[in-house]
Structure formats: C-alpha cells, structure tokens
A protein has these predicted regions:
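Substrate-binding groove of N-acetylhexosamine-processing glycoside hydrolases
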Residues: 1-232, 428-429, 433-439
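Flexible loop residues that form catalytic
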Residues: 12, 288, 336, 396, ...
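Disordered, acidic Ser/Thr/Pro-rich linker "stalks" and the adjacent N-terminal cap
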Residues: 204, 208-295, 299, 311-320, ...
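A structural motif specific to WD40 beta-propellers
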Residues: 307-309
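Proteolytic cleavage junctions
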Residues: 328-332
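Short beta-strand-plus-loop segments that form exposed binding edges in beta-rich domains
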Residues: 333-339, 439-446
C-alpha cells in the first residue's frame, strides 16, 4: 500500500458513464481516512457534468440499482424516499392521501421528468449522452408515470371514479411504454434492457397502479383487498423465493433465475399463474438437482384444486411440457416427499398462445383492467339485468367515439339509457329496472375497448 500511486480501471464500452464510480474510487484511494462517499459522489456529478449538475445528480441517484437478477445483487437507491413512499402507500390503502409525502414525491417526479431534457440541452459531453441515452429516455417516462400515478391516487381519494379511470389509463400507457423500451433498447448487453428506479420508485408506481385497479373494481360487497386480479404472477411458500421477482413477457411468465441452492421442505412449492383469458402453449423448467423421487408438477384452473401433470420423468432436471390441459391457469412444482429437497431454480416459465381463441365474456369479466374486448362499429354486446343493483363499464377509445347503452324490455321495447363519451360509466338500478337486458354499441367509425363490466 505504501507504494501505491494510482489504480487501473477498465470500463470497456461505458468509459464516460463509468466516471462517477471511478471518481469515487479515486477519492477513496487519495485520502482513505477522510473519505466521504456522499460528498465524493456529489463532486463526481459536478465535475463530470458541471453544466447540469443537479439534473445529473437526480439521474444518478435513481439509477444505482441493476434491477432484479439471479445473483440477488441489489444496490441502495432512492434512499431518501423510502420512508415517504411507505407512509404514502400505507395511508392510501386506508383511503387517505398523505399530503406531505405526496408533495415530496410529486416534486421528485417533476424533477425526474425534466432532468433528461436539461442534460440533453446543457451538457456538451456528447459521448456520455450517447452511452446513457436509453436510460435518459426511460427516466423521463418514469417521471411522467409517477406524476400520473399520484394524480390517479388523488382522484380516487376525491371519490372521482371517472377521473381516476382516465388517469389509470394514462398511467397504464406510460408503464407499457417503459416495458417496450426495456424490451427493445440495450438488447446486446448483459443484462439486457433498460431499468430505471428499479429498487424503489418503479415498484412504488406499480404498487400504486395495482392498488388503484383493485379500488376501481371494488364494490359495496367486495373490498379492494378482496378483489382477485387476473395478472401474470408467481407464487410460493418457500421463504427463499418469496422476494424473487417475476419475469414477464408478452406471452411468458416465470421466475428470474436464482443462482443459489433453494431448500424445499416437504409440501412446499413454487408456482406461476397467468391471465384467465389465456391458454398455456408450453411449460419449461430447469431445476438442477431436483430430479429425485417426490418431485411432482401440478396444474389448476382456480389455484385451489390441483391435478397431476402426467408423464414428467423424475429423471429429468429440465424439460419442456407441451401437453397442458387447456383449463390450466396455474402450474406448480411441489415436494411430495417426506425429505427436504435442495435444487436450483434456473428456469420455471409458462408460454401462452399468441393467438388464442379468446372468449369475449372472459375479456369483459376477467377482473383485469389491462385487458379488453374490442367493440367494433355495428357490433353489440348484451348484459342481463336480473339480480343486479348496479352495473359499471370501464371503457376506452378515441375521444371522437361515443357509446350508446340501450335498455331492452321483455316485450322488445328499446330506450336509450346512456349516450355519450367512452370512459367510466355507472348505471344504478333505477336507470334499468324496467329492462331485462342492456345493449351496448359504439357510435362512430372506430372500435372502442371494453376493459371490464362490473355487475353489483
């Protein structure tokens, strides 16, 4: 150590982007006893991008974590906002709107939205901008999604379901854009994709979005926490896997690989589930050391009653199963022995059919606001009015399109119950009590989307 005068680094293709980390190492080796990591980080940001140092600091502060990975290696990120987020989510789930936390987060998301354009316009370091460009693009979407999600939550707090639904659709579109960027940019590197705010901020937006979806689908008889949303998911009663993230694609759902031994006690399991309107095409597993007696694979239509998947040899640690019951919506591997199993989870994925024959009734009643049934011009959907006190429609489409809801009586008489813009529409019983069914159709040249029909 007494002869050390410097250090060597090899940032490979990200030389400029690596300078923040290299600067910190340099400050540490220069004066180990008085090293201040926070100050070194601030100095690095100021030195590398003096023209837009605050914007660059904001970008770096919320881009530390590599995202979910098989090594379970995560970095601290957005540390100053963990407590406000926890406070806000806890309050929101109790139908309150913690304003202090909301204002703090609203300011942050506004800064995040503005930071990329400031970096683009003010920094002359074109090589650095080129290296971080995919993350700058994604970062702006993160800020917009966070802002939209907070507006969505406030609308729900104000008991404005119509505006909540508008903001829900906006937040959904922004999150979809982030998914698209993650799947299309930076695909040649390892790890692939573009993840920003992956430790704290992005999970917060998704949590807020999903909680609001449950709120919207709730009724007087079904509380938000009782709403069972049909989305791709993983489930397990193995402690080691409970925090393992879900790897979700357009037509796939599975576990992010875990490169450590997983201990599976008797009757413990790991499983996956997918949307109610989709049918599985295949199931692949890669579970080294699992090929031993007592390992069973099972499927279920409802997540409660399970049936054995036949003809899966216990001699194979990995395999692809293509004969899956069309009713299956869940698959799990369970330790059916009286001994502990030790295995690796390198692959556990279901692939759904890309062009399934979708039952439109499932699309409109699947308890998933992200899916929808296309209602084309001239097409009609009928809803029976028996034994319901209210019916809600979650619709989306062009602002130029109108929707018409007509009541049909037993003797064939028709009367318009609603005619107007698409969006959230709720009809109380007094509006249709004289009718046996309702008929919904679009007025215009374009189709509309029926995301959900909720009968109360």
């Amino acid at each position: 150590a007494g002869t050390m005068t410097g250090f060597v680094s090899n940032p490979i293709e990200y030389a400029e982007a690596s300078k923040v980390a290299i600067f910190g190492v340099g400050m540490y080796t220069w004066n180990i006893e008085n090293y201040d990591p926070t100050q070194a980080w601030k100095d690095a940001c100021d030195f590398i991008m003096p023209e837009a140092s605050m914007a660059f600091r904001i970008f770096c502060e919320h881009n530390c974590d590599p995202g979910p990975n098989g090594h379970q290696y995560r970095r601290e990120e957005s540390a100053n906002y963990v407590a406000p987020i926890q406070t806000f989510l806890a309050g929101y789930k109790k139908n309150t709107f913690p304003e202090q936390s909301a204002n703090l987060l609203g300011t942050l998301f506004a800064q995040i939205t503005a930071s990329p354009s400031m970096i683009y316009s003010q920094s002359p370091n074109k090589r650095l901008i080129e290296q971080i460009n995919p993350w700058l693009i994604q970062f702006e979407f993160l800020g917009k999604a966070g802002t939209s999600a907070l507006h969505m939550a406030h609308a729900w707090y104000e008991k404005d379901r119509s505006y909540t639904w508008q903001r829900y659709l906006e937040t959904s579109a922004l999150l979809d854009s982030m998914k698209l960027i993650n799947r299309t940019l930076n695909q040649k590197a390892q790890p692939k994709g573009v993840k920003v705010g992956s430790k704290v901020l992005h999970p917060f937006i998704v949590d807020l979005y999903r909680q609001t979806g449950r709120n919207l689908l709730s009724t007087d008889g079904i509380a938000p926490d009782e709403v069972k949303v049909s989305i791709p998911s993983i489930f397990t009663n193995i402690d080691q896997l409970k925090s393992q993230p879900c790897a979700e694609g357009d037509n796939t759902v599975g576990y992010v690989p875990l490169f450590e031994v997983v201990k599976v006690q008797p009757n413990q399991y790991l499983g996956i589930g997918w949307e109610i309107q989709k049918e599985a095409e295949s199931f692949c597993f890669n579970l080294p050391k699992s090929n031993q007696p007592g390992r069973v694979f099972e499927w279920s239509a409802d997540g409660k009653s399970w049936s054995l998947i036949p003809h899966v040899s216990t001699e194979n640690a990995k395999d692809t199963i293509r004969t899956i019951d069309p009713k299956a919506r869940y698959i799990r591997m369970r330790n059916n022995s009286d001994q502990q199993m030790e295995l690796y989870v390198l692959g556990f994925t279901a692939t759904t059919k890309q062009d399934p024959q979708i039952n439109e009734a499932l699309m409109m009643y699947d308890m998933n606001l992200d899916t929808y049934k296309n209602l084309n011009p001239g097409e009609m959907i009928h809803i029976k009015c028996d034994d319901i006190n209210a019916v809600s429609f979650f619709l989306s489409g062009s602002n130029e399109n109108l929707v018409s809801i007509t009541g049909l009586s037993q003797d064939g008489e028709k009367n318009i119950v609603y005619q107007g813009n698409v969006g959230y529409i709720k009809l109380n019983k007094t509006m249709f009590e004289d009718f046996s069914s309702l008929e919904i159709t679009t007025i215009g040249k374009e189709s509309i989307h029926i995301h959900q029909i909720v009968r109360e």
